[in-house]
Amino acid sequence: MLMTISGGRWNGPIWDTHIHLDLQARGLSAAQDFANAGGTHICLVHKPSFSSGLPKSIEDVDHAYRRTLDLAESVRRNIGLDVRVVLGPHPVVWEKQIHTLGLESSTQLHLDSVELALNYCAEGASVALGEVGRPHYSVSDEIWSAANAQLETVMRMASQAGFPIQLHVEDNGAKTNADLGIICDR
């Protein structure tokens, strides 16, 4: 596809590089609105369902990932958008699960979920791992330290598998970027 401006109008692809679709909210109508506005491509990022309960097992995670993949296919078929999928365990899920599963079990489920998402990447069903990162709100020093250690492990896993990550981090500008740079340099 030739990408140019013709008659004052862009005729190339128009991407939403980070969209969550929630079937319990607007679902496909949000994708339809994007297409109606001229959108051509979306990067559908897995969104955990906080309202229907967080996963307690890797089987629960797999079921949630498959729902995201099914949703992507539905958007392709019904709306006609080009859809790329990003799968991964959200850091807020990990932090919330600490309070019910404990730090060790929550962390293990998170890392198992990363491995599962990377398997979907290797199969071609997903293009990246995400959202992974840190909680975007204040947590205890212990949880913050664990989040940083876990993020380093997740980054290493993605790097070794050869897939990009989509980060979920707090909004703290230069400090956040500097912190992430330190983690990347290890």
Predicted regions and their residues:
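Mid-domain alpha/beta scaffold segments of enzyme catalytic cores
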Residues: 1-163, 167-169, 173-185
